[in-house]
């Protein structure tokens, strides 16, 4: 434990909390051509690459992902949730925060049912998370 004199000289330094989704905390002013510190819950971007990757050790699958260039100029890797998707290069997507635990470097999710991303077909439960409309009653 420090002495009173050591605390008077140096003092306690509080920890700085870093964001888990830093690309959502940057904006871009295209008129002034400068980056701004504007936080937003989602951001729009254009897919530059769509593909699959394999998860970390105990799991085995082909997880769908997209490399997305956001409106603030930052390029991030985002996970495509749900079964099947219609994304390809140059698709305009909406990104939200939220990492995928077994995919290293994937800190963002693509919002299904927004912009060019279609909702998941034939989904009955948890539809709001996958952008699926309510099925018609027969």
From Swiss-Prot:
GO biological process, one term: translation
Modified residues (3-methylthioaspartic acid): 102
Entry-linked Pfam families: Ribosom_S12_S23
Xref: SUPFAM superfamilies: Nucleic acid-binding proteins
Domain of life: Bacteria
Keyword Nucleus assigned: no
Keywords: Methylation, Ribonucleoprotein, Ribosomal protein, RNA-binding, rRNA-binding, tRNA-binding
Quaternary state and interactors: Part of the 30S ribosomal subunit. Contacts proteins S8 and S17. May interact with IF1 in the 30S initiation complex.
Protein name: Small ribosomal subunit protein uS12
Source species of the chain: Bacillus licheniformis (strain ATCC 14580 / DSM 13 / JCM 2505 / CCUG 7422 / NBRC 12200 / NCIMB 9375 / NCTC 10341 / NRRL NRS-1264 / Gibson 46)
